[in-house]
């Protein structure tokens, strides 16, 4: 095995390590949400879900803008964060209806003393979900036979939260790919051998792994 093949094997190993960290943390977060909401009423579940999703949105923004404290103040509300994330290309525009629906549901509770979430409310929520988020909900809820509104609510909210959390990690990977594309283009333009490129790729992957571990430790 030559030096390039050795480094390529290391790169594959690092990529698997990153995927493992990412998958484990996401699964852990979902289980935590389902556990801590046991015994809570619908209002508590919605408020907690809204809070968790907003936390992920703020993390996404803080990791991708300069001087975040200048804009992420107490007056910068949930939908402001959604709109800013979309404007900066950090969140797909197609996700807006999903997150807005969560905010609308939360506001219904805030403004109606006797509001109770219904099956129709949840079906309306699911109907505006992006396909990826909807598929995640369907996977969580597929083995539920009884009509349990609270469980359905928890599965809806955990699907949205998982999407927000994944977006934070995926953006870090995208930044790594952008760096590698730029380096590859420089190599083509100014010269540079494959071994140098792969060595740099390994270095950047290690930095990415450390970055993701740092983000995970924020919890």
Show the residue positions of the predicted features.
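Amphipathic alpha-helical interface elements
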Residues: 2-84, 90-218
């Amino acid at each position: 095995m030559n030096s390039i093949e050795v480094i390529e094997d290391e790169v594959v190993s690092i990529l698997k390590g990153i995927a493992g960290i990412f998958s484990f943390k996401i699964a852990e977060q979902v289980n935590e949400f389902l556990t801590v909401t046991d015994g809570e009423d619908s209002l508590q579940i919605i408020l907690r879900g809204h809070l968790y999703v907003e936390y992920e949105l703020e993390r996404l923004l803080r990791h991708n803008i300069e001087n975040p404290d200048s804009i992420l103040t107490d007056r910068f509300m949930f939908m402001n964060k959604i709109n800013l994330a979309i404007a900066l290309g950090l969140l797909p525009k197609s996700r807006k209806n999903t997150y807005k629906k969560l905010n609308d549901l939360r506001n219904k509770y805030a403004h109606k003393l006797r509001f109770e979430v219904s099956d129709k409310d949840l079906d309306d929520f699911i109907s505006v979900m992006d396909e990826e988020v909807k598929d995640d909900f369907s996977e969580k809820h597929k083995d539920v036979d009884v009509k349990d509104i609270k469980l359905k609510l928890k599965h809806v909210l955990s699907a949205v939260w998982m999407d927000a959390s994944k977006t934070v990690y995926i953006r870090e990977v995208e930044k790594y790919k952008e760096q590698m594309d730029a380096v590859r283009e420089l190599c083509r333009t100014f010269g540079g051998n494959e071994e140098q490129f792969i060595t740099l790729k390994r270095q950047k992957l290690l930095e990415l792994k450390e970055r993701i571990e740092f983000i995970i430790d924020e919890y």
